[in-house]
Amino acid sequence: MLFKKEALEEFDVQPVTSQEMDIVINQCMNAYQNRPHWLSDKNDIRTIGFAKVLCEETARLATLAIHVTIDGSARAEWLQQQIDKRYFKFREWLEYGCAAGTFILKPNGKGIDFLLPNSFQIVDSDDDGNITGVVFVDQYTESGLLSRKYYTKFEYHRFNEDTGEYLISNRTYMSTSEGEKGRPIPIEETKWSGLEADVSMVKQNGEPLERMLFGVFRTPQANNKEINSPLGLPVYQNVLEELKNLDIAYSRNSEEIKDSRRIILVDDSLAMPDGEPISQRKVGRTIEGLPHYAKAVFGGTGDKPFYEEINPELNTDTRIKGINNELSFIGWKVGYSSGYFVFDQKTGMVTATQVESDDRRTIQFIKDVRDKLEDCMDGLIYALNVFADLYGLAPVGEYETTYDFGDITYNREEDRMRWWQYVVQGKASAWRYFQKFEGMSEEEAKAMIAEAQGEQKEPTLFGQE
């Protein structure tokens, strides 16, 4: 975290998290960004970036068909608008959160700040590991014709234990040199001019606020690096050694494939032009016209010129089996069902019931992640509601939030067959089936059904019998 020391000194506070946690998070973020510490040009060890795959898949499943609905009043409509503006950021935010273990969503008066652990320092927490004091660092740069100005803001959130007030303190600085805090300046001279230097807040009825004015996402697994830490662990922190083994196995397999080219070693006497004296043979002599896989060698004698074909045998099947074992073990330790990640695709039809049975561990893991995401969104919406009161952004009113997620075991063909049975049995209207599975509007589906029914009622050639 840039200016960590200066930010803590500004408010005379100390971090409650250890340096070890900073190291763990940095190590994991390097793996996520395809820069794991085990990369080696000397030993030809590369990475397939599977740490990102784990985060990406977790975020994809957890945000599948996510819907956040806020109802109840004009205030609720305003809150809904704020969430809808960021709808397509949910998956991205969650992927980064899985990589870093923690993220914070905080209203800033004009929008929403997304913050990873390198942008904040936790300075207080309760016995349950909930954040009760935190310092945020924010920066931006202004470029002029001859120079640049670097602006920094330290923002301190905490509760006053004596009065129950929620306190926010903002301190701003400007420097003409990158990497320096610079001199203090009034907040009105920065882009944060809409904020106040010091704010104290309680509810309109004078009661203390119920929670901090931001949402916190923390991965669901317990932190075994720092017990009762307010920070979560990256989802793959427990499999770094296995990720290293996976990269080594992949690199060895790729190296073997690269070196598997067919080679023919042929005596240079066999490649000499007709009529050229044998006495002109020389060691290291280049012979033009040979294919790229043929190499001339010097050493044959008389009527026994040297010739040998080398066709390296690949151990691909064995190596793929080993890679799949690593993948399965990695997935299981992260929270996925055994065999969820494999190189070879699954074949055959799988019903939703089978998927639910086979992937029960995956389903539970994703549910846990969704629960944590819901709690984070609840915190964000609560903070937006308080800011709306503070700055008069929307009319006062009640709101209620509901969350809906897609079923990760959903099978469209199975659902189609079930709905068609409903239609045949008279339990559902046919137009609903066509709307749901054929992409028709309600009007189009009803018109098609009416047309078909009309054709069936037309009289035959000899009239109605």
Feature locations, PLM:
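Activation/maturation switch segments at domain boundaries
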Residues: 417-465
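Extended, helix-rich architectural segments
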Residues: 1-145, 464-465
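Extended, charged amphipathic alpha-helical segments
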Residues: 195-357, 400, 406-408
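Active/binding-pocket-proximal capping segment
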Residues: 330, 344-351, 380-387, 393-402, ...
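Extended, regular secondary-structure scaffolds
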Residues: 104-233
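Extended, non-catalytic structural segments that build the interaction scaffolds
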Residues: 22-45, 298-333, 350-375, 400-433
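Short amphipathic alpha-helical segments
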Residues: 75, 82, 86-90, 238, ...
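Short coil/turn segments at secondary-structure boundaries
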Residues: 94, 107-110, 257-266, 340-346, ...
